[in-house]
Amino acid sequence: MLPIGIENATKIMNYISKGGKEYVCVMQVHCEYNKEELAKIISSFKGEIYQRPPVRSSVKRRLRIRRIYDIEILDMDKKLVLLRVNCDSGTYMRKLCHDIGIIYGCGAHMRELRRTRSGIFTESTNLVKLHELSEAIYLYKNCKDETELRRVLIPMEFATCEIPKIVIEDSAVNALAYGAQLAVPGVVAYQNFKKNDTVAVLTLKGELVATGNALMDSEELENAKKGIVVNLSRVFMQRDIYPKAWKKHES
């Protein structure tokens, strides 16, 4: 399961990549094992663990903390163990299998790996095969039928489902598209959030305008009359889609 962004949606992929992951992997144990003893060791990895990335990895090999939210044994067959793991982003399954083998005493390694969830995107509901995408593009280009294309392409707003949202006035949209900061008077509605939380800024129609870090709590915003609400980090709305609502100062 690999979410892919195209055009403007590539800007939001950083938020998706930081979401939790679910993997199904095959671990091979290097000796005959007692099922109950191995199951007990595997379950002990649930919670916070220390991991140092493998030698062959794309990041620096620094010791770091990752959380295993759930680890489940799906099947055991001879020396093979089928696992389902829900974990933080950046958790290495091959290192997890290696560490389980060390604790058991005879070693283990990962044989196969499949990612079944990335953030809010799951294999059961969002997975699209390449041939399906190819067929959808063919139907759109040659038959002017966009039904399949709309099925396989998901609006980028979907990626903000787990991010607190702030809805703004239409009059503030173009100002933000030009780089202005979001001030209190431009806010129409909002969900609960804390200072420094990542928030998504939407139009009244639900279109994604920008994302950024909150400069105040939602409780503080409730009574505020002025001030900057969000420090914008990514702007998605194209300029001049919404009309300008500010005037230039006369010289």
Swiss-Prot record:
Reaction(s) this enzyme catalyzes, per UniProt: uridine(55) in tRNA = pseudouridine(55) in tRNA
Molecular function per GO: pseudouridine synthase activity; RNA binding; tRNA pseudouridine(55) synthase activity
Principal EC category: isomerase
The EC number(s) this enzyme carries: 5.4.99.25
This protein's UniProt keywords: Isomerase, tRNA processing
Function noted in UniProt: Could be responsible for synthesis of pseudouridine from uracil-55 in the psi GC loop of transfer RNAs.
Record's protein name: Probable tRNA pseudouridine synthase B
Organism: Saccharolobus solfataricus (strain ATCC 35092 / DSM 1617 / JCM 11322 / P2)
Gene for this chain: truB
